[in-house]
């Protein structure tokens, strides 16, 4: 089974694409390390204060996928206070 988590993120106070990328890149790398998920920026590439990232996870247990992907969202909200999670959606295929 494949789990896909799509997260819309808001970066308050960002005034350039360079600043947005400098804040987004460490977040992506940290998620990859902490949760062993594949992560990529998927949309809103040219918007200064917003981004959409997707996390993908493969596992045989749908419940484990769901728990892990929900943990990703909770972890972002706890450990990255300068980032606002606007929306998140989990899809299991």
List where the protein language model places each region.
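Solvent-exposed alpha-helix faces
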Residues: 25-29, 36, 70
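C-terminal binding/interaction regions
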Residues: 20
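C-terminal structural segments of small proteins and small subunits
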Residues: 57-93
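Short glycine-/aliphatic-rich beta-strand segments at the starts of folded cytosolic domains
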Residues: 3-13
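Amphipathic alpha-helical assembly/interaction segments
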Residues: 16, 30-32, 36-40
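Structural beta->alpha junctions
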Residues: 11-15, 58-61
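A short linear hydrophobic-aromatic micro-motif
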Residues: 37-43, 84-88
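Short, charge-patterned binding micro-sites
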Residues: 2, 40-61, 92-93
């Amino acid at each position: 089974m494949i789990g896909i988590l799509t997260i819309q993120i808001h970066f308050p106070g960002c005034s350039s694409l360079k600043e947005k990328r400098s804040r987004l890149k460490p977040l992506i790398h940290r998620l990859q390390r902490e949760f062993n998920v594949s992560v990529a920026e998927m949309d809103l590439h040219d918007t200064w204060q917003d981004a959409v990232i997707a996390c993908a996870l493969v596992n045989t247990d749908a419940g484990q996928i769901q728990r892990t992907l929900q943990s990703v969202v909770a972890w972002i909200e706890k450990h990255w206070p300068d980032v606002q999670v606007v929306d998140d959606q989990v899809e299991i295929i």
